[in-house]
């Protein structure tokens, strides 16, 4: 990229900065949840909604981000995304109740939903096609550093300052990023077709109310009648979307996507698989602090081996899949992740803390292999005219399933535990043990889906073409 103009390189730095902000925020909050609960006077068992409110909002808003960027301009939307994300961070820091914090996190999620896809779109428009892969590698690298720094930085700020600072640090960075965007980024627009507002609203309502219903009485205190009503509304909304999308060329997501068998299996497996793996980043730091008495900073440091294992495995995942095939790799990594989850619980409860970094490193390796394989299996056989729509649907499903996973983890803690959990309590460790056992079972279930994948090793070369677009 050395032959790119200085203005283009600065624009790539702005996009990279947005990727870093978004990825850092997805992990920095996890280690702060017990401290937030204490400060806000809430049970730690309710704090999963701090993550769910953000991730679910991202899932709901993702389908609109690309259309908005084409219609209004990439600079205007990227600037708006940074401003909303920064304002959300400010309101998070000022929150005095859990409900205020959830609303602020939702505002953050609106900004986060637009930041990454619009950033990708910006790179496509400002960089020559032959340099696109190198440019995307450059801008996504900070996004890989964010999860590495997030848990430890969050723990450090909580331990030596307060949880408010995990949001306050976004404000000066966001102001600088917003000014740089206005000054340096071009405002590319494109001719757009009419946005499928009806389909968007139906999907948004379906996803939101079903997730809220899943949290149910344990998380939100809803009555059984209200939960039943939410389930009915959610199911009706999704059925109406299917009827709306039938034979509709302007539908948000075409049902023609599901004529490709690998897409259908990959999407179903990705949805089920990420429900299980989405529990781990939430449960691990909470368990280390509440169940084992680790400090926030120590718990954050323990998450680093998992990220390192994930980053290291990405270098060889193509060769692994090409050698063994999708079916073997996905079934093995799904069952392997379930076993590693049980191994983590066992070593932790036995007090073998020195083994935990190695277990978490292994967990990161297995999870990374499964993620990359799921992503590329889903997209590799789609025709070119459906690839963009399929990628957008996969991105939405990834966020939705992670929010459901965190919701289920919080629900399991609520089912097995009391309203208040104390550190070093034998009862607390029993609650976490039952929760981890249930999680291991949920993580293993998608193996039944992946067992139906054709083991067509000779087609796996497509992973190298699709890998980056799916991440």
Swiss-Prot record:
Periplasmic side: 1-11, 70-76, 125-137, 186-196, 246-262, 307-341, 417-430
Topology relative to the membrane: Multi-pass membrane protein
Keywords for this protein: Cell inner membrane, Cell membrane, Membrane, Transmembrane, Transmembrane helix, Transport
Source organism: Escherichia coli O139:H28 (strain E24377A / ETEC)
Subcellular location: Cell inner membrane
Protein name per the record: Putative multidrug resistance protein MdtD
GO terms, molecular function: transmembrane transporter activity
Domain of life: Bacteria
Transmembrane segments annotated in the record for this chain: 12-32, 49-69, 77-97, 102-124, 138-158, 165-185, 197-217, 225-245, 263-283, 286-306, 342-362, 396-416, 431-451
Cytoplasmic side: 33-48, 98-101, 159-164, 218-224, 284-285, 363-395, 452-471
Pfam families: MFS_1
GO cellular component: a single term: plasma membrane
HAMAP family noted in UniProt: MFS_MdtD
Gene encoding the protein: mdtD
CDD domains found in the cross-reference section: MFS_LmrB_MDR_like
InterPro entries per the UniProt record, alphabetical: EmrB-like (IPR004638), MFS (IPR011701), MFS_dom (IPR020846), MFS_trans_sf (IPR036259), Multi-R_MdtD (IPR023721)
Similarity annotation: Belongs to the major facilitator superfamily. TCR/Tet family.
